[in-house]
Regions:
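Hydrophobic h-region of N-terminal signal peptides that target proteins for export
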Residues: 10-18
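Structured catalytic-domain cores with a bias toward divalent-metal coordination
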Residues: 3-5, 17-385
């Protein structure tokens, strides 16, 4: 951590609008805030802040970077606010570059924006540091927490742990306060070891979410009720349209998928009239596979997975999709597709243990209980969600 002297800090703060609840600290030349108030952010420019979101053992503060592209002065009243969040899972890195690219682009456009874009390129600082999915809490023997299951978080005074407080501060000091987010897009990849193309979770019961999901023009669009405690579902529960976007693989920057997602964000900004555009944005759905059900197939053995079907290939019920082999190369198990559909996620890491996924199939179930979305597992189709 590189804190400036009080004189240098004062100089930095003097060059910004004097508000936004600054803590008085400056980290790597960037002012630290504990609360974002858009009215206090300079209009027609991009501002950078660090938001203080908690503490580690030893009292070391935790910060996350925040970028704000605030448009014309009147756009706080006339325009909408879009939030882009990335890397709540620390190994999911394609989204980081999407947020960076959008704000690089907005440098030349912010003066005319009718609205505001808030960017969080790295939501989970502990996950980023450890280059893995979860937030590490050091107390006792240590534990790992999926931060995308604890929103809107828990306050320190109510016994919140590190990840709970991180979520609490992001929600209450950034999104649900005077920033008044109108649309939230949470960017992900699959967990390490898995591969997909471009897809999304979308709760079509919520206003504007169907439109938002189609603007993505994904390879697979999963109609889904969402996960309690996730960013997407928390936004939706509070009446804010939101989408979870999944991009390719963890721990890589896939330029093609980054480009497609940047294009998506631009379509959303035009659709919300934050950015200028000619006419209504018409998404191209000609290659979009819309499904209400994901069905996971898992192995009962430890060994090595041999994929037989690539991502986005069509499959038929009973078609072999993977072999599981032992160390000698013998086939221990052949997994088959549970239904006619499409391979939407497949393991890139061949190493597996009992219970590991060897492929997830997307399809449309005729079960009325799956009309708003289902996630099933195993040969019997046990319902996980």
């Amino acid at each position: 951590m590189q804190l400036l002297t009080s004189v240098a800090a004062a100089a930095v703060l003097a060059s910004t609008v004097s508000a936004a609840n600054f803590t008085g600290d400056v980290l790597n030349g960037v002012p630290v805030i504990h609360d974002l108030i858009l009215a206090d952010v300079p209009a027609q420019k991009i501002s950078r802040y660090y938001l203080r979101v908690g503490e580690l053992n030893g009292g070391h503060p935790v910060h996350i970077p925040v970028m704000v592209a605030r448009g014309t002065p009147e756009s706080l009243e006339t325009g909408k606010t879009l939030s882009l969040s990335a890397a709540i899972h620390g190994d999911e890195l394609n989204p980081v570059r999407v947020v960076q690219r959008i704000f690089e682009q907005l440098e030349g456009e912010v003066a005319t924006l009718n609205g505001t874009v808030i960017g969080l390129p790295t939501v989970n600082p502990m996950g980023i540091y450890l280059n893995q999915r979860n937030y590490f809490t050091a107390s006792a023997s240590g534990s790992l927490t999926n931060v995308n299951r604890v929103f809107p978080g828990t306050a320190p005074a109510l016994g919140g742990s590190g990840p709970d407080i991180l979520a609490f501060n992001i929600w209450n000091q950034l999104w649900a306060n005077a920033s008044a987010v109108d649309v939230g897009i949470d960017l992900h990849t699959p967990s390490s070891g898995g591969e997909t193309s471009l897809w999304c979770y979308a709760d079509w019961r919520a206003p504007y979410v169907e439109r938002l999901s189609k603007l993505l023009q994904p390879d697979t669009l999963k109609v889904d009720v969402g996960e309690p405690g996730s960013i997407e579902t928390t936004f939706v529960d509070y009446g804010v349209p939101s989408l979870t976007v999944e991009m390719g693989q963890a721990k890589v920057w896939n330029t093609s998928l980054i480009d497609r997602t940047v294009d998506f964000v631009n379509r959303v900004m035009r659709d919300l009239h934050i950015a200028p555009g000619n006419g209504t944005v018409e998404p191209d759905l000609s290659r979009v596979y819309i499904a209400n059900t994901f069905h996971d197939t898992y192995t009962q053995y430890g060994g090595f997975v041999e994929r037989l079907v690539a991502v986005d290939e069509p499959v038929t019920k009973g078609q072999p999709i993977a072999h599981v082999r032992n160390a000698f190369g013998d086939i221990l198990e052949t997994l088959v597709s549970p239904a006619d559909g499409r391979m939407f996620q497949s393991p890139r890491d061949p190493s597996c243990e009992p219970g590991s996924s060897v492929g997830q199939i997307a399809y449309n179930s005729t079960d009325p209980e799956c009309a708003d979305g289902c996630i099933l597992s195993g040969p019997a189709g046990s319902r996980r969600r």
